[in-house]
Amino acid sequence: MVDKKVDKKPVPEDWPHIVGDYVVGDAESPVAVVTLGSHMEDEPVRAGAAISGPLHTENLGIEKVVGNVIANPNLRFLLVCGAEVMGHITGQTMKALHSNGVDGETGRIIGATGAIPYIENMPDEAIERFRRQVELVDMVDVEDPAAIRERIGECVVHDSGAIDEEPLILRPSEDLNKNKPDENT
């Protein structure tokens, strides 16, 4: 296989700047992995992901993921895998956010079935940037490390390069960084 060169952008020195329960790999990788209710340690990062961690809540947790993704323009795929979180339904909510966005008046993620699917701490431009920047790879309820590694590898091969926009850095509110700072990638 021939290595192809794709354009990459510098990543802010403090990336990922929103605290959470995640492992960081090569910031130039095009893949971010959300493992939902499953803890896969550093397996996705060892397979080539830039960042990986669980996602337990469909509101602040998703805001943290979005904030860290849009701060790294090299991320072009969001692989959503692992066991769905009962009640919060974070996998379905992330898919709804990516497909449908957010109701501009209520902040509710359109089409989400989770208990509290509201985005309250992010501007619309951040959500739209997230939706443009990454392709969502749906592996909800898949926990097989070999299948996840294979999919990460496929994403790396199909890397189209960084989005032609600068990093979008949102400084988190007190809610995002103080409430359960080590949870919700």
UniProtKB/Swiss-Prot annotation:
Keywords assigned: Cell membrane, Cobalt, Membrane, Methanogenesis, Methyltransferase, One-carbon metabolism, Transferase, Translocase, Transmembrane, Transmembrane helix
Gene Ontology annotations for the cellular component aspect, listed alphabetically: plasma membrane
Catalytic activity annotation: 5-methyl-5,6,7,8-tetrahydromethanopterin + coenzyme M + 2 Na(+)(in) = 5,6,7,8-tetrahydromethanopterin + methyl-coenzyme M + 2 Na(+)(out)
Side of membrane Cytoplasmic, spans: 1-21
Pathway terms, separated by semicolons: One-carbon metabolism; methanogenesis from CO(2); methyl-coenzyme M from 5,10-methylene-5,6,7,8-tetrahydromethanopterin: step 2/2
Cofactor note: Binds 1 5-hydroxybenzimidazolylcobamide group.
UniProt key word Transferase: yes
Locations listed in the record: Cell membrane
Top enzyme class: translocase
Keyword Repeat in annotation: no
One Gene Ontology MF term: cobalt ion binding
Membrane topology, as annotated: Single-pass membrane protein
Residues in compartment: Extracellular: 39-185
Main location: membrane
Known cofactor(s): 5-hydroxybenzimidazolylcob(I)amide
Disulfide bond positions: none
Family: Belongs to the MtrA family.
Quaternary assembly: The complex is composed of 8 subunits; MtrA, MtrB, MtrC, MtrD, MtrE, MtrF, MtrG and MtrH.
Function of the molecule: Part of a complex that catalyzes the formation of methyl-coenzyme M and tetrahydromethanopterin from coenzyme M and methyl-tetrahydromethanopterin. This is an energy-conserving, sodium-ion translocating step.
Protein name: Tetrahydromethanopterin S-methyltransferase subunit A 2
Species this protein is from: Methanothermobacter marburgensis (strain ATCC BAA-927 / DSM 2133 / JCM 14651 / NBRC 100331 / OCM 82 / Marburg) (Methanobacterium thermoautotrophicum)
